[in-house]
């Protein structure tokens, strides 16, 4: 694995449908005090003129659009834990959630908050063990 890659993640991630392009506003699923996160960049850049997009388990750079004033107007990393866009798992099941959500992390992928509201995707739990330990349901 290269030196510059996923901070606290372990293992590989299969190809999945990218459901959250740059400019997407997602719910914040942790107890930091942020309500909405605005995705400003993603690691994946695809075809010419296509917006970079992210999926469950991807780390993105985001800002807080609604929430505590001390969290707003700062760029911070976040990990996507739920997406509405259906994706296909290796066992043939098509999976999707009822909302788009992410959690705020530090650059290494460790969480400061202690709780995550709602379920998280198995792809995210496999890659980010600190997020998986704080989740109450892994789907």
Curated annotation (Swiss-Prot):
Signal peptide (from-to): none
GO CC annotation terms, alphabetical: cytosolic large ribosomal subunit
Lineage: Eukaryota, Viridiplantae, Streptophyta, Embryophyta, Bryophyta
InterPro entries for this protein: Ribosomal_uL14, Ribosomal_uL14_CS, Ribosomal_uL14_sf
Gene Ontology BP terms: translation
Descriptive protein name: Large ribosomal subunit protein uL14
GO molecular function: large ribosomal subunit rRNA binding; structural constituent of ribosome
Pfam families: Ribosomal_L14
UniProt record similarity statement: Belongs to the universal ribosomal protein uL14 family.
Keywords linked to the UniProt accession: Ribonucleoprotein, Ribosomal protein
């Amino acid at each position: 694995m290269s030196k510059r890659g996923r901070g606290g993640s372990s293992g590989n991630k299969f190809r999945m449908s990218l459901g959250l392009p740059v400019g997407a506003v997602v719910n914040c699923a942790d107890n930091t005090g942020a309500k909405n996160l605005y995705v400003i960049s993603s690691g994946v850049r695809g075809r010419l003129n296509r917006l970079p997009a992210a999926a469950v388990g991807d780390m993105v750079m985001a800002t807080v659009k609604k929430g505590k004033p001390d969290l707003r107007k700062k760029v911070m990393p976040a990990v996507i834990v739920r997406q509405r866009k259906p994706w296909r798992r290796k066992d043939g099941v098509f999976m999707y959630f009822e909302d788009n959500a992410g959690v705020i992390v530090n650059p290494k992928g460790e969480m400061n908050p202690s709780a995550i509201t709602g379920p998280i995707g198995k792809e995210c739990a496999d890659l980010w063990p600190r997020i998986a330990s704080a989740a109450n349901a892994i789907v």
